[in-house]
């Protein structure tokens, strides 16, 4: 820095420039055309803002957008920097200004074209600091003055409002009043498919070969006058009539009233009267209560106004659609790829990571496996400042289908491959590089993002490839694609039996993954204690040279990493297992709220220059304190659309003595397809959203009779979903046709509040992100590899005054409804049992007869049998009836 100061001083000696001689300078540009000749726009660079202590959002804010600058400081800056000074265009105005301080104003909305403007007159400065009061007559007169300056506002789509014009158009439109006759002519079914031969034939040679349509006069069109449009209106005659009573005899008269007062004697007697004393004693308590209420609460407040929401908010309430802010596409990839997972960087605002995979089926992957080995599988880091070039590229042995940033250290990333391996990256060496990206700085420096035309992408930028630190063992890990991965919280850790212990290290050291091979695995990134000690010679033989660009953070895990414990969800009596696709732990809602905590931890880690992951101790110790009241149950979504609530703790099998996974606590088959999303609400610990197949469901952890909400079948299959981060009753659902359904439970609970088209193909992932209290974004990835960044409107990002209480009341009401349905089901089953018992009793009563009745019935049956036998024998001629007696003679 010292040589630069010498150069500046040498310049000052060689070419001194008098400041007061400003006749040769060009005239400064003012805003006389806009009616403000005292205003001179300026462009102040960051260096000039630091010199004059007028930095945006630090020295100059929205509450105080101006600063008084000493005239001598401007002259000093002109002497030091000459024509390079930002005040050089207004040098003449500064010289002619009579006062000692000039008013510099920050033009946030670029009303006058630049980011600052200078007020060149004392009168203008006084009018800005102390604006004159405008009378009501002048304000009414201003409404009729046409404005010469028009600010262009882009058109915004608004919902159509009916004003009745469509009814007039329908009345004037011509519609057919008569019903049309339709003829359908077809061949016989026996002649279908018969060969057809066409030939020439004379129409006159065959009888009835043709039908002649001769012309004849139509009587329907012989009317001379058809119709006439005639309009008539009856209007009564109007007369103006007025009456006025005349004041014939005017007189001036005045009237005055005065109150009747007690005399002194009456006052004394009234004070001593018992009724007055009793009244004062009884009324004094009520008066004291009323006075206390007046002191405690404001009795003049208007409760009706407080029912509505505040109007002085950011954004347009009528705008309910997502607006596309930016999009990212990997233009340098030679193959067609899709985005499988999206994650915003927890601490660096404006940085987002996506994993991409080749769009091939299983058979095509096997066929083109040789070519796919030559192409790297990547996780791309995109920044808002450069939509073309990725900031970082994380390499992996195969395509990544899910990944997560470590909650304790955002520079540690874990991902799951399609081949069943877990990959670990450490980007600590590149943290400073991605933190200093243009447009992606910390949240404290800026409150809003810059538009794209103000950002300058870096030219001739080379892609930064980062190799992985460690890969899990192929033999001991998953056998198929890893569909979901989660970090366990830094407050606990588990052992091989699933028991929960206190985590004394204070960092996240364990992972949980689920795969399509019907297993759920828990992993520990710390080095495990070897069963047998190894000699130093053997260690030297097994040592492998590490490339210089690969950190040694997780070198102890590379190709030898095994799961701590493995779970299989059996289907009960059968030998088959459930195939998990997504899981949701009880601690997931806590990890969603740790962005500020991670930011503070990253700052302290920088100050200490010590990464705790570089000195990891061995696995779970024996002296850790167990946590007894910890909930070890979690939700699992399967490939068949089942939602399972199970426990990761092991139990000992009484027959074999081995530790086996527990049976699922509950199982519901709600979805008719693969479960793509299981996510806990960021506002309620026990509310879970599941998305799969053609419908959506919302569950409560303590209610296992069924879902609180189950949507009907959608027009297209659902592929992803996510809760809103700021509104408890809003969640976003992606479909396979490129539409996104936005559900608002305050508005509708049976269907989406609105649907919006985002792309032309399937939506694969949805991730919202809070940039500032006034601005939110949502990242939507599609099947063609494009990442869409959309801005969330005000109505979908800002909750109402009582939204959380209303949604909580809705969930409680649905819980009561499920309990009522369950009670009615039990009552109905009991009623059915009672009805069956009554029917059985009636049947028993019918068949239980007395002995006399049974003998009488048997006697009647026997007599009927004898009669039948007699008739049969008579008909056969075997017997004859004599006239003398009633006996029978056998022939």
UniProtKB/Swiss-Prot annotation:
PROSITE patterns per UniProt: WD_REPEATS_1
Protein's UniProt name: Dynein axonemal intermediate chain 3
Keywords: Coiled coil, Cytoplasm, Repeat, WD repeat
Location(s) in or outside the cell: Cytoplasm
Assembly mode: Interacts with ACTR2; this interaction reduces binding of the Arp2/3 complex to the VCA domain of nucleation promoting factors. Part of the multisubunit axonemal dynein complex formed at least of two heavy chains and a number of intermediate and light chains. Found in a associated with the catalytic heavy chain DNAH2, the intermediate chain DNAI4, and the light chain DYNLT1.
Skewed-composition ranges (Basic residues): 1-16
Domain of life: Eukaryota
One term under GO cellular component: inner dynein arm
Transcription regulation in keyword set: no
Entry coiled-coil feature ranges: 817-861
GO biological process, one term: cilium movement involved in cell motility
């Amino acid at each position: 820095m010292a040589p630069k100061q010498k150069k500046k001083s040498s310049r000052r000696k060689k070419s001194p420039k008098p400041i007061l001689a400003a006749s040769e300078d060009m005239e400064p540009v003012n805003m006389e055309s806009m009616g403000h000749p005292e205003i001179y726009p300026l462009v102040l660079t960051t260096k000039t803002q630091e010199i004059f202590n007028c930095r945006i959002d630090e020295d100059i804010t929205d509450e105080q957008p101006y600063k008084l600058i000493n005239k001598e400081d401007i002259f000093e800056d002109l002497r030091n920097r000459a024509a390079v000074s930002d005040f050089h265009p207004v040098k003449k105005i500064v010289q002619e200004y009579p006062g000692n301080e000039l008013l510099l104003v920050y033009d946030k909305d670029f009303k006058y074209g630049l980011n600052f403007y200078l007020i060149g007159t004392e009168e203008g400065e006084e009018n800005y600091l102390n604006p004159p009061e405008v009378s009501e007559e002048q304000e009414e007169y201003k409404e009729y003055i046409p404005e010469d300056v028009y600010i262009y506002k882009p058109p915004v789509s608004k919902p159509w409002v009916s004003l009745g014009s469509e009814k007039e158009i329908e009345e004037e439109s011509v519609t057919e009043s008569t019903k049309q006759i339709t003829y359908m002519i077809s061949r016989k079914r026996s002649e279908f498919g018969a060969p057809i031969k066409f030939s020439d034939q004379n129409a006159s040679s065959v009888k009835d070969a043709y039908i002649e349509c001769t012309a004849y006069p139509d009587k329907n069109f012989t009317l001379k006058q058809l119709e006439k449009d005639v309009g008539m209106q009856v209007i009564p005659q109007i007369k103006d009539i007025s009456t006025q009573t005349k004041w014939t005899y005017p007189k001036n008269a005045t009237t005055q009233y005065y109150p009747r007062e007690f005399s002194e004697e009456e006052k004394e007697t009234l004070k001593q009267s018992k009724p007055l004393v009793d009244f004062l004693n009884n009324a004094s308590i009520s008066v004291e209560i009323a006075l206390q209420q007046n002191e405690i609460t404001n009795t003049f407040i208007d409760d009706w106004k407080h029912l509505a929401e505040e109007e002085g908010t950011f954004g347009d309430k009528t705008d309910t659609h997502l607006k596309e802010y930016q999009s990212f596409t990997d233009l340098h990839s030679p193959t067609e790829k899709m985005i499988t997972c999206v994650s915003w960087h927890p601490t660096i605002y404006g940085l987002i990571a996506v994993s991409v995979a080749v769009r091939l089926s299983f058979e095509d992957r096997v066929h083109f496996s040789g070519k796919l080995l030559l192409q790297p599988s990547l996780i791309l880091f995109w920044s808002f400042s450069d939509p073309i070039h990725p900031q970082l590229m994380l390499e992996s042995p195969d395509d990544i289908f899910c990944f997560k940033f470590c909650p304790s250290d955002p520079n540690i990333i874990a991902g799951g491959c399609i081949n069943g391996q877990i990959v670990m990256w450490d980007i600590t060496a590149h943290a400073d590089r991605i933190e200093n990206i243009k447009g992606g700085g910390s949240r404290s420096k800026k409150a809003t993002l810059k538009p794209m035309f103000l950002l300058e992408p870096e030219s001739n930028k080379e892609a930064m490839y980062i190799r992985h630190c460690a890969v899990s063992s192929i033999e001991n890990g998953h056998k198929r694609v890893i569909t979901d991965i989660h970090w366990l919280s830094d407050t606990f850790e588990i052992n091989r039996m699933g028991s929960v212990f206190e985590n004394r290290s204070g960092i996240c050291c364990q992972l949980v993954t689920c795969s399509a091979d019907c297993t759920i695995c828990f992993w520990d990134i710390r080095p495990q204690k070897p069963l047998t000690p190894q000699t130093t010679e053997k260690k030297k033989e097994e040592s492998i040279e590490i490339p210089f660009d690969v950190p040694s953070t997780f070198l102890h895990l590379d190709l030898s990493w095994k799961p701590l414990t493995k779970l299989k969800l059996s289907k009960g009596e059968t030998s088959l297992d459930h195939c998990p696709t997504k899981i949701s732990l009880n601690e997931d809602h806590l990890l969603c709220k740790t962005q500020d905590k991670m930011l503070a931890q990253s700052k302290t880690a920088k100050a200490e220059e010590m990464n705790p992951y570089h000195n990891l101790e061995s696995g779970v110790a024996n002296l850790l304190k167990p946590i007894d009241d910890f909930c070890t149950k979690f939700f699992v979504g399967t490939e068949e659309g089942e939602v399972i609530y199970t426990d990761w703790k092991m139990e000992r099998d009484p027959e074999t003595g081995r530790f086996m996974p527990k049976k699922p606590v509950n199982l519901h088959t709600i979805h008719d397809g693969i479960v793509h999303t299981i996510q806990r609400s960021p506002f309620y610990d026990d509310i879970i959203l599941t998305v799969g197949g053609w419908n959506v469901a919302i569950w409560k952890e303590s209610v296992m009779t069924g879902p609180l909400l189950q949507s009907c079948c959608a027009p297209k299959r659902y592929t992803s979903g996510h809760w809103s981060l700021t509104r408890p009753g809003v969640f976003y659902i992606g479909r396979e046709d490129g539409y996104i359904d936005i559900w608002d439970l305050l508005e509708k609970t049976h269907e989406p509040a609105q649907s919006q088209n985002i792309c032309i193909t399937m939506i694969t992932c949805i991730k919202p992100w809070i940039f500032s209290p006034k601005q939110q974004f949502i990242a939507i990835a599609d099947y063609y590899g494009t990442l869409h960044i959309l801005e969330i409107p005000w109505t979908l990002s800002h909750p109402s005054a009582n939204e959380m209480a209303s949604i909580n009341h809705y969930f409680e009401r649905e819980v009561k409804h499920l309990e009522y349905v369950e009670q009615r089901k039990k009552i109905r089953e009991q009623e059915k049992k009672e009805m069956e018992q009554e029917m059985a009793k009636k049947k028993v009563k019918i068949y239980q007869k007395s002995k006399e009745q049974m003998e009488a019935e048997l006697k009647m049956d026997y007599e009927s049998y004898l009669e039948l036998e007699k008739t049969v024998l008579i008909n056969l001629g075997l017997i004859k009836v004599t006239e003398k007696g009633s006996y029978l003679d056998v022939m």
